[in-house]
Amino acid sequence: SGSKTAEIGDGCFGVPIDHIGSTSGMGCGRPRPKPTPGGS
């Protein structure tokens, strides 16, 4: 779950601006990346 923290900084989810996108993944503008090891 370590990679999850990196994704938050990406502006995908975890940010107040992407409150809705955090669930639908639309706030990213692209398919939300999966927390894969070595992905950071």
UniProtKB/Swiss-Prot annotation:
- Point out the coiled-coil segments of this chain: none
Region described as Disordered: spans on this chain: 1-40
**Subcellular location per the Swiss-Prot or TrEMBL entry:** Secreted
Keywords (alphabetical) are: Disulfide bond, Hypotensive agent, Metalloenzyme inhibitor, Metalloprotease inhibitor, Protease inhibitor, Secreted, Toxin, Vasoactive, Vasodilator
InterPro entries attached here? Answer: Natr_peptide, Natr_peptide_CS
Tissue pattern of expression reads: Expressed by the venom gland.
Q: Which cysteines are joined by disulfide bonds?
A: C12-C28
PROSITE patterns, per this entry? Answer: NATRIURETIC_PEPTIDE (PS00263)
Gene Ontology process terms (BP): regulation of blood pressure; vasodilation
Where is this protein primarily located? secreted
The keyword Secreted is annotated on this UniProt entry? yes
Cite the Pfam families for this sequence.
ANP
Any single Gene Ontology cellular-component annotation: extracellular region
What role does this protein play?
A: Exhibits hypotensive and vasodepressor activities. Recombinant PaNP-c inhibits the angiotensin converting enzyme (ACE).
Additional observations:
Negative results: recombinant PaNP-c does not demonstrate any stimulation of cGMP production via the natriuretic peptide receptor-A (NPR1) and does not inhibit platelet aggregation.
Please give the family membership noted in the entry. Belongs to the natriuretic peptide family.
What is the official name of this protein in its record?
Answer: Natriuretic peptide PaNP-c
| Protein species of origin | Pseudechis australis
